[in-house]
């Protein structure tokens, strides 16, 4: 595709609207947003570890690339006029995904639902038409790729391989026998919460700042993602790593992370911490 020639095309307003609806719905499936996110849960839960990592780090970010490559430069008038609809969809997605995350007991489901919530934050950031919002959306997209990949490795590549279950209710006191893993898992969990000194915080803060500049009221509701992400991530980490004595369902001789797992997780942790 010759994008230079495409960008020189001046579409009239009705054509922009028609193209905007079609292209945005396609990218909303890939983001994903509310009503179009049902495929993501099964894709994450049923796929192997490598599939979950590729899906979280690369495939979901293709919508962000497509928005920057097609929607914003080609359809500026339609994007500007329908920002409030995208914001409304984003806010509903954040709240719905967060409540769904709070009720799940499967680790991979929890990380998958949190991906939906974070994706909605960078979606509304890039449509804010502000420098801060667009840069924040890019930063949050990168940060989410590092953190979610690390969390999926922790859930599927470390915990599931050693225990044979992904249910949070079976875990307790892992920090007693896997201290090195617990430290790496803790830092990645902090990144998922968006605490300061992580790339997630920079991206989330700038995205929400861009939202507040355009529509302050919806920005207030979008900011609930900060509270919700802390709630379900702290619950997940606290129940798995601490939560009392070591769970009786597991063997006491479960090994800590090996060198391969350690260096993979350490690389993602380094990219996560600012």
Predicted features, each with a name:
Residues 50-65, 115-126, 149, 178-185:
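Small-residue-rich segments of transmembrane alpha-helices in multi-pass membrane proteins
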Residues 44, 124-129, 204-219:
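Interfacial segments of multi-pass membrane proteins
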Residues 1-37, 67, 71-85, 133, ...:
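Juxtamembrane/interfacial segments at transmembrane-helix boundaries in multi-pass membrane proteins
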Residues 148-152, 213, 220-253:
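Predominantly late transmembrane helices and immediately cytosolic-facing juxtamembrane segments
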Residues 31-44, 95-110, 157:
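C-terminal ends of transmembrane helices
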Residues 1-11, 102-114, 118-166:
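Alpha-helical multi-pass transmembrane bundles of energy-transducing inner-membrane proteins
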Residues 178, 234-274:
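Cytoplasmic/organellar membrane-interface segments at the starts of transmembrane helices
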Residues 57, 87-90, 111-115, 140-141, ...:
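Residue-level recognition of transmembrane alpha-helices
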């Amino acid at each position: 595709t010759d994008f230079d020639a495409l960008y020189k095309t001046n579409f009239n307003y009705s054509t922009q609207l028609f193209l905007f609806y079609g292209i945005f719905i396609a990218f909303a499936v890939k983001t994903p947003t509310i009503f179009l996110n049902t495929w993501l849960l099964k894709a994450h839960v049923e796929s192997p570890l490598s599939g979950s990592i590729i899906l979280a780090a690369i495939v979901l970010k293709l919508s962000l690339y497509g928005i920057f490559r097609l929607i914003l430069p080609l359809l500026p008038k339609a994007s500007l006029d329908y920002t409030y609809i995208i914001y409304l969809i984003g806010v509903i997605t954040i709240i719905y995904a967060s409540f769904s995350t709070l009720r799940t007991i499967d680790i991979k489901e929890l990380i998958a639902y949190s991906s939906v919530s974070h994706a909605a934050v960078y979606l509304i950031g890039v449509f804010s038409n502000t420098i801060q919002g667009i840069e924040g959306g890019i930063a949050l997209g990168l940060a989410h790729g590092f953190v979610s990949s690390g969390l999926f490795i922790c859930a599927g590549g470390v915990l599931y391989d050693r225990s044979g279950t992904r249910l949070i209710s079976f875990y307790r006191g892992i920090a007693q026998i896997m201290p090195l893993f617990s430290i790496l898992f803790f830092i990645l969990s902090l990144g998922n919460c968006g605490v300061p000194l992580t790339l997630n915080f920079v991206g989330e803060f700038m995205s929400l700042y861009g939202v507040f500049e355009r529509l302050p009221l919806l920005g207030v509701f979008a900011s609930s993602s900060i509270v919700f992400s802390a709630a379900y991530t702290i619950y997940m980490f606290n129940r798995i790593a601490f939560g009392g004595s070591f769970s009786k369902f597991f063997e006491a001789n479960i090994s800590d992370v090996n060198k391969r797992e350690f260096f993979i997780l350490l690389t993602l942790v380094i990219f996560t911490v600012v």
